[in-house]
Every structure is written in C-alpha cells, then in structure tokens.
C-alpha cells in the first residue's frame, strides 16, 4: 500500500505532540539523520534576509522661505493648532511617527510643495 504525501501529512496532523516527537525520533534512528537545523549553516550566510521597513518617521528639517505655507501644510498633516504648528515649523522636528510608506511619502510631498525640507526615516 502506497500513501500519498497528503495522506501522510493528514495522518501526522491527527497525532498528539508526544506522538509526533516519537515519530521524529524513530525517523532519526531509522535514517541516521538529525531533525535539528545545522547551526553553522544558518549563521554562515551573509545574505541574511533584510526585513523591509514598514513604519516610517517623517521629520521636518527646514521650513524654507515660505513659512506661512509650511505652517498651513503642517496643520493639515498633523491636526495641530496654529501656535503648535508654528512652533514645530520654526524648530523643526517629528511630524509623524509610525506612518506607512504611502502616508509618509504623501506628507513629504505636501510639505515639499509648500517649500519645506522633509526627511523620511
């Protein structure tokens, strides 16, 4: 009787954790292999997977010559009051933390069009 891979997987899925551990030990003994991942091979590759950044911080670095336009853009983006937006525009600093890539790019575009210098970190 020949079992398909799907039938084998289904049979293993029905077993308890202890039964699966016993099965792994039996396979290791029968075939002379180890289920443990080789440590040297995992640490050897310099081509480690780099996670793509998903959250971005938008920082105002310079308000430029059009200060009034930048203050309006800062208010629109952050929802701050006039005084707070003016202080942030003059001092520079964090506009938005944990923004998505699209949102960060949109904020940067709006403020750059108003004359500000903005960084996405």
Curated annotation (Swiss-Prot):
User: Is Ribonucleoprotein among the key words of this record?
Assistant: yes
Where does the signal peptide begin and end?
Answer: none
User: One GO CC annotation, please?
Assistant: cytosolic large ribosomal subunit
Q: Which example biological process does GO assign this protein?
A: translation
Q: Which UniProt keywords apply?
A: Ribonucleoprotein, Ribosomal protein
Drop me one GO molecular function for this one: mRNA binding
Q: Please give the Gene3D superfamilies that the UniProt record associates with this protein.
A: 3.30.1390.10, Single helix bin
Q: Which domain of life is it from?
A: Bacteria
User: Entry's Pfam families?
Assistant: Ribosomal_L12, Ribosomal_L12_N
- Role played: Forms part of the ribosomal stalk which helps the ribosome interact with GTP-bound translation factors. Is thus essential for accurate translation.
Quaternary state and interactors = Homodimer. Part of the ribosomal stalk of the 50S ribosomal subunit. Forms a multimeric L10(L12)X complex, where L10 forms an elongated spine to which 2 to 4 L12 dimers bind in a sequential fashion. Binds GTP-bound translation factors.
Q: Which family does it belong to?
A: Belongs to the bacterial ribosomal protein bL12 family.
- Name of the protein described by the UniProt record: Large ribosomal subunit protein bL12
Q: Which organism is it from?
A: Xanthomonas euvesicatoria pv. vesicatoria (strain 85-10)
Q: What is the lineage of its organism?
A: Bacteria, Pseudomonadati, Pseudomonadota, Gammaproteobacteria, Lysobacterales
């Amino acid at each position: 009787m020949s079992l398909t891979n799907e039938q084998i997987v289904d049979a293993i899925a029905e077993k308890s954790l202890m039964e699966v551990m016993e099965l792994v030990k039996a396979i290791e003994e029968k075939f002379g292999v180890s289920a443990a991942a080789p440590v040297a091979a995992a640490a050897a590759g310099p081509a480690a997977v780099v996670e793509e950044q998903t959250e971005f911080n938008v920082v105002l670095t310079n308000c430029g010559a059009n200060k009034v336009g930048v203050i309006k853009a800062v208010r629109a983006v952050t929802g701050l009051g006039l005084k707070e937006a003016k202080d942030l525009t003059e001092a520079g600093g964090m506009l938005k933390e944990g923004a998505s890539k699209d949102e960060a790019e949109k904020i940067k575009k709006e403020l750059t069009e108003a004359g500000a210098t903005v960084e996405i970190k």
